[in-house]
Amino acid sequence: MSSADDHCALAFQYLDDDRLSDSEACFRRALAADPDHLLARTQLADLLLSLGRWEEAWPLNRVYDGKPRPDAPPVPFPEWRGQSLAGKSILIWPRFGLGDQIMFARYFPILRAMGAQVTLIVLPMFGNVFDGLDCNVVHAADELFIPPQDYWVYSALNPNRLNQSLATVPANLPFLRTTPLVCDLPPGPKVGIAWRGNPVHANDADRTFARSNFQALEGLGAAIIPLDYEVSGATTLAQTADLISKMDLVISVDTSTVHLAGTLNKPCWVLLPKHRTDWRWLRDRSDTPWYPSLKLYRQTARGDWGTVMAQVVADLRAKLAKAM
């Protein structure tokens, strides 16, 4: 391994031990040894983002500025990298997680306010959930026609290109359109649950847990409703959004269900892993600037969902006692 690789490996060890200052220092030493070390740049950026130091983080993530991006979509027009959008058109290309595409849709009005005509490519599994947005919505199909544009951008890169900070996270939540899901729901309080996300996610083993963990919620006085599409019968996120809208509360691991609930302003308790928590949830806080209706429950030890669920059970019992 190179010297930069050695520093990077040590930075990860410190990160896993919550020695954040030491981890940051090692990532910086890796970059001093090799300024183009991709892993050190992106991981230091994630660490800084999780600490709320976004202005320091964004430049580190601009690793392809000034050169072709190897993961660029198959379109003939250039990537948007912060240029003026007055009188321009821009294509939002789908990439990263489903939740990312929901969460970062709040930036489309900013692009429009900058003078852009915005076109959004929507994957089939979203259904019509984005059809109410104030932009051109193109549903992806086998034969996808993309009108000529001035620029393209990944939705998740908009906070970076717009130089966002914690103080400037847009409070406006995008309007989501729902598609009715025919199902029989019991009377009384209803709690929707989601216990798994994308199985190919790099941190899936830590952020997903067994459905049996939710057995602790039974017998508290609320009907427990699975939101997982393989159980609920939903075939699109628009149908899942409809089901969520009928819940009194959602309890979910870190997956797209959280973003649907948050955008619908539905109370949602998010169960977060100790290991490699996503930067968007920041650190050591139970709220989030992204969604006012969310409450965060964090593991205090890697793999310990029992302590998390004990707190969830206590809070749900208290909530039900107040008749939700």
Predicted regions and their residues:
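Catalytic machinery of carbohydrate-active enzymes
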Residues: 1-324
